[in-house]
């Protein structure tokens, strides 16, 4: 299938073939993908986030399954966000850690942490063999929006502390998008995944961006249901963004 949009063409969307669902082992999935050869894709990306799309490398996609609508786009209204008790404890527990924003350029330390994270947290998940090429293809976008938010132990004698987490984040003129976070698997007690989102929310507030996109919430899924804890949360119902509800129906309509 040839796909090659021109600057004045209508935006083209393509539906993928069925593939194993990445969340439910007994289901098949398909996605809508924007034409990856469209030269306007970088400019479209900020609006695509508001349409419920996500970035993986240079692909913009959205789940589009015939018999399942469990993947619900969600975003945090950062100006209305209030951390709950558990999140406040997470911040206090990690108050000595250092956070910094760096260019989205892979280095050996980040790659080592990424591979260790995948090996221990997602064994046999299809990504645990990732190396430098896969890291770049998956995480580093081509349009200049990407940043790496590093979370480290405090420096010692001028030497940077241990790298504990990297939150791959896209910073657009409208919002932040949490692309992927990987962290030290042997530091589970710190709640580094939660900490990363809390710091991304603070980052969005500093940059005066009203939203942090968290991708897809899946009700009762052991890996995806946690996103409901970051309130005030909004869901995309296929037409517009609404206040979060665990019972609100969703559609596939663009």
UniProtKB/Swiss-Prot annotation:
Top-level lineage group: Bacteria
Reaction catalysis annotation: N-terminal L-glutamyl-[protein] + L-leucyl-tRNA(Leu) = N-terminal L-leucyl-L-glutamyl-[protein] + tRNA(Leu) + H(+); N-terminal L-aspartyl-[protein] + L-leucyl-tRNA(Leu) = N-terminal L-leucyl-L-aspartyl-[protein] + tRNA(Leu) + H(+)
Subcellular location as annotated: Cytoplasm
GO cellular component assignments: cytoplasm
Principal location class: cytoplasm
One record GO biological process: ubiquitin-dependent protein catabolic process via the N-end rule pathway
Transmembrane segments: none
Keywords: Acyltransferase, Cytoplasm, Transferase
InterPro entries referenced in this protein's UniProt entry, alphabetically: Acyl_CoA_acyltransferase, Asp_Glu_LeuTrfase, N-end_Aminoacyl_Trfase, N-end_Aminoacyl_Trfase_C, N-end_Aminoacyl_Trfase_N
EC number of this enzyme: 2.3.2.29
EC main group: transferase
Disulfide pattern: none
One Pfam assignment: ATE_N
MF annotations from Gene Ontology: arginyl-tRNA--protein transferase activity; leucyl-tRNA--protein transferase activity
Described function: Functions in the N-end rule pathway of protein degradation where it conjugates Leu from its aminoacyl-tRNA to the N-termini of proteins containing an N-terminal aspartate or glutamate.
PANTHER family according to UniProt: ARGININE-TRNA-PROTEIN TRANSFERASE 1, ARGINYL-TRNA--PROTEIN TRANSFERASE 1
HAMAP family, sorted: Bpt
Family stated for the protein in its record: Belongs to the R-transferase family. Bpt subfamily.
Protein name: Aspartate/glutamate leucyltransferase
Organism expressing this protein natively: Xylella fastidiosa (strain 9a5c)
């Amino acid at each position: 299938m040839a796909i090659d949009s021109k600057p004045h063409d209508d935006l083209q969307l393509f539906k993928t073939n069925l593939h194993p669902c990445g969340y439910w082992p007994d289901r098949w999935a398909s996605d809508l993908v924007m034409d990856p050869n469209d030269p306007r894709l970088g400019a479209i990306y900020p609006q695509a986030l508001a349409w419920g799309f996500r970035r993986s490398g240079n692909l913009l996609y959205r789940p589009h399954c015939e018999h399942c609508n469990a993947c619900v786009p969600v975003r945090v209204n950062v100006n209305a966000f209030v951390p709950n008790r558990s999140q406040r404890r997470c911040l206090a527990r990690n108050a000595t850690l250092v956070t910094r924003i760096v260019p989205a350029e892979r280095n050996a330390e980040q790659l080592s942490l990424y591979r260790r994270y995948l090996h221990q947290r997602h064994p046999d998940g299809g990504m645990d063999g990732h190396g430098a090429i896969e890291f770049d293809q998956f995480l580093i976008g081509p349009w200049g929006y990407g940043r790496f938010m590093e979370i480290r132990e405090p420096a010692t004698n001028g030497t940077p502390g241990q790298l504990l987490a990297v939150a791959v984040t896209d910073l657009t003129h409208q919002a932040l998008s949490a692309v992927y976070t990987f962290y030290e698997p042997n530091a589970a007690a710190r709640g580094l995944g939660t900490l990363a989102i809390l710091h991304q929310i603070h980052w969005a507030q500093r940059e005066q961006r009203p939203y942090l996109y968290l991708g897809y919430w899946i009700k009762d899924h052991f890996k995806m249901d946690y996103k409901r804890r970051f309130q005030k949360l909004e869901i995309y119902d296929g037409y517009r963004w609404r206040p979060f509800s665990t019972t609100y129906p969703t559609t596939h309509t663009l």
